[in-house]
Amino acid sequence: DKPLMYQGMSHRFYGPYDDIPFISEEDGIDFEGEFGVIVDHVPMGTKAEDAHQHIKLLVQINDWSLRTLAPAEMKTGFGWIQAKPACSMAAFAVTPDEAGAAWKDGRIHLNLEVSWNHTDFGHPHGGEMSVGFHELIAHAAATRELCAGTIIGSGTVSNDNFRATGSSCIAERRGMEIVYTGSPKTPYMHFGDQVDMQVNYPEGNLLFGVIHQRVVKLNA
């Protein structure tokens, strides 16, 4: 099976402490905790087993999403534009060796800790990625070369045991609420809300730094 992948915005990233402007709360503002990798030049047709060598840096991403806008765009059969504004990135990109034993199988085997308005929202583990980064790179490079600096995101960090680990995005929690109660209970974000994300080594040190951001209304 081919992995789900879309081509996102490449010319703009928010910093880890930036306020994030949006036009309307009605658009369904959602955070989305992810990992990512930055590659060197990847030749067209690179196979998954050869893609590991092209991974040069690991990063932590908040892939902002506008969930109310997404369904209409998905129905077109083309990629997202309005539903996927600029992402945020943590302060530090690290080489794979800096992650030590946590970097294996093309995955980051650490918890992504997420809080929303100072309340724990989830700590899913990156080791449960259904497809490793090396496989994602091979998929993206199947019919094109990837230039040095290309960023490949993991998608939402999510675990099967979500009841214990929580979530890294609101949409997943709302989906589970629909499954188990028949309707979503958790609202999307409001202006003034804050989201924090970080990844800790087992000894407690931060791997990428902290994403600490507030949602604000765009000034007209």
Language-model segments: which ranges?
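Generic detector of contiguous secondary-structure segments
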Residues: I137-G149
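Conserved metal-binding segment of the jelly-roll/cupin
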Residues: M9, G15-P16, M89, L146-S158
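Active-site pocket scaffolds in enzymes
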Residues: T150-G192, Q198, I211
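Glycine-enriched loop-and-adjacent helix/strand subsegments that border the catalytic/binding cleft
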Residues: D1-H139, P184-P187, H212-A220
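Structural signal for terminal/edge beta-strands and the immediately following C-terminal loop/tail
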Residues: D196-A220
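A structural signal for short secondary-structure junctions
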Residues: G106-I108, R144-L146, P187-G192, N205-L207
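Residue-level marker for beta-strand->alpha-helix junctions and adjacent short loops that shape enzyme
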Residues: P96-A99, N159, P202
